[in-house]
Regions:
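Short beta-alpha connecting loops at secondary-structure transitions
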Residues: 60-64, 109-111, 319-339, 361-376, ...
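A helix-coil-helix interface module used to build multimeric assemblies
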Residues: 35-239, 245-260, 321-322, 332-336, ...
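Short, positively charged and aromatic/hydrophobic N-terminal segments
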Residues: 15-32, 37
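C-terminal hydrophobic structural anchor segments
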Residues: 419-470
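Glycine-rich anion/phosphate-binding loop at the beta-strand->alpha-helix junction
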Residues: 215, 274-367, 371-372
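Short amphipathic alpha-helical segments with heptad-repeat character
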Residues: 66, 158-169, 176, 202, ...
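A short, charged helix-loop
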Residues: 258-273
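Long, amphipathic alpha-helical stalk/connector segments used for oligomerization, subunit docking
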Residues: 343-430, 438
């Protein structure tokens, strides 16, 4: 038999080499086929755009199968540990085995089991028991499906709210910095989308920021009142635990306290049916909808300002605005904010109807809807905040065109200044009613000149030429300074940041989150 030597000096025989090569080729072929299946699954079946385009990996994980089912197992561990400490026939060895296998989930086995038993919780009980043979007999002892299902949902919502809070605080901080930077830059203020008076770019930003602060306050409130379901049994009576603990009420209450503490909660709900009240889902999703409202207001304002060429969202060097019109710079980020916000605002109707249709101690018509609506409320808001983090970034975010802003201010300022001009003339002895009528007539003339002839606003020239106003060019120039018409804008911004924003930032800190935008 021929014998060769490889670079390590070991003898390799042709027959063995051949068999090894065949095995490697077969394995590679299997991997290739599996990859083809994965690719096919990603292109010939529906995938949520929240996962493929919009939401962060962090938020996607929170609503993933791994997060859900490992939390189920952690709850089973907490239940077993508490039952052991309270004297039930559960051993430390069994608890240790359960704890060691929290992440050892055979999803194929669980799926096969669910096809047989048509019950997701029991499928996972059996799957967990297979890898924990010593603890198999005590898994889920005294519990009902909602012990793992509902408690996990509460834990997931808590974790998701904390992610939302962290990003929301950073957006608030970035908007406050923007407001401070531009607190003294006069711009047109609008009512009915018509120029009204002046405000400043920074003062307007405080309006966006303040609404987000209101949302943060609501979010903190919902976080503070969030409680675990606990271990209430099939209809909320804890009858199974009364049997297990032979009527010892104190032990049953201690069981819940221990479980809540292990899962990071201060308390469980005082009373329930089989489930926690679905009003909790509605209250939480209502906060998500409120954040979406605030974001939509911000996004719409930026879209309008971009159409005026006053402020633009960031536009990348290689970004294409239109497939036909190469010159376009569309506000696609803010348009996406508004689009996603609309979805989240409508989504809140789902938990509202779900809460209203929970018959007696529970029905199952909440389940399918809840799996979709609660997750998508968070995924949607996460996507919105990611975009807002990008758009409000202090280095590469909103672009302010101060010269355009000033030019548009000066085009309208003559109309806005007429009251001050009239007051000065009255102080010099003029007739208020006659001057008011003259200003009305001159304003109509100047307006027609602008709209019908496309010429500049000449209202100031018309007033200067009328001796009844008794005003000089120097006096007119002094009146026509935009800063004279912004009231307390700068002070309001300073006070808002000092009294409203700074306490929030000091209490929460600012994360180092970087906007995660895929497209």
């Amino acid at each position: 038999m021929l014998c060769f030597r490889n670079i390590t000096g070991l003898a390799i025989y042709p027959e063995i080499c051949y068999n090894i090569c065949v095995c490697i080729i077969m394995e590679l072929s299997s991997v290739q086929n599996h990859l083809k299946e994965v690719i096919a699954m990603s292109t010939n079946s529906y995938e949520s755009p929240f996962c493929t385009r919009y939401a962060s990996k962090e938020m996607q994980y929170i609503f993933s199968a791994d997060k859900k089912f490992t939390t189920w197992r952690k709850l089973w561990v907490a239940l077993a540990r508490a039952e052991m400490k309270l004297g039930l026939p559960v051993t430390q060895e069994q608890v240790d085995e359960l704890e060691a296998n929290v992440n050892n989930i055979d999803y194929d086995m669980a799926a096969a089991e669910e096809k047989i038993v048509r019950h997701d919780v029991m499928a996972h009980v059996h799957t967990y028991g297979k890898c924990c043979p010593k603890a198999d007999g005590i898994i889920h002892l005294g519990a009902t499906s909602c012990y793992v299902g509902d408690n996990t949902d509460i834990i997931i919502m808590r974790d998701a709210m904390n992610v939302v809070k962290r990003k929301l605080v950073k957006v608030i901080d970035q908007l406050a910095n923007f407001a401070d930077k531009y607190k003294g830059l006069p711009c047109l203020a609008y009512t009915h989308l018509q120029p009204a008076q002046l405000t400043t770019v920074g003062k307007r930003a405080t309006l966006w920021c303040n609404e987000l602060l209101m949302d943060l306050e609501d979010l903190d409130f919902q976080l503070s009142r969030l409680k675990l379901l606990g271990s209430k049994g099939t209809t909320g009576t804890q009858a199974s635990f009364m049997e297990l603990f032979e009527g010892d009420t104190d032990k049953i209450k201690e069981l819940e306290r221990m479980i809540a503490e292990e899962m990071g909660f201060d308390a469980v709900v005082p009373v329930s049916g089989q489930t926690y009240s679905r009003k909790v889902d509605f209250a939480v999703c209502q906060v998500m909808a409120a954040i979406a409202q605030s974001a939509m207001k911000f996004g719409n304002d930026i879209r309008l300002l971009q159409s005026f060429k006053e402020i633009e969202e960031p536009f990348e060097k290689t970004q294409i605005g239109s497939s036909a019109m190469a010159y376009k710079r569309n506000p696609m980020r803010d348009e996406r904010i508004c689009s996603l916000a609309r979805y989240v605002m409508c989504d809140v109707l789902n938990p509202a109807f779900t809460a209203g249709t929970q018959w007696f101690e529970r029905t199952l018509d909440d389940s399918a809807n809840k799996r979709i609506s609660v997750a998508e409320a968070f995924l949607g808001v996460d996507a919105i905040l990611n975009i807002m983090l990008n758009v409000t970034d202090p280095d590469n975010g909103l672009v302010v065109y101060d010269k355009i802003i000033t030019r548009r201010v000066m085009a309208e300022l003559p109309f806005m200044a007429t009251e001050n001009i009239m007051m000065d003339a009255v102080k010099k002895g003029g007739n208020r009613q006659q001057l008011h009528e003259k200003i009305r007539q001159y304003s109509m003339q100047a307006g027609a000149r602008v709209k019908q002839e496309g010429l500049d606003n000449n209202l100031c020239e018309l007033i200067l030429a009328d001796p009844d106003f008794m005003i000089t060019k120097e006096e007119m120039d002094a009146i026509m300074k935009p800063v004279n018409f912004i009231g307390r804008c700068s002070q309001q911004v300073d006070e808002f940041i000092e009294n409203c924003v700074k306490p929030v930032i000091e209490a929460n800190g600012v994360s180092d989150d970087v906007a995660e935008i895929n497209v």
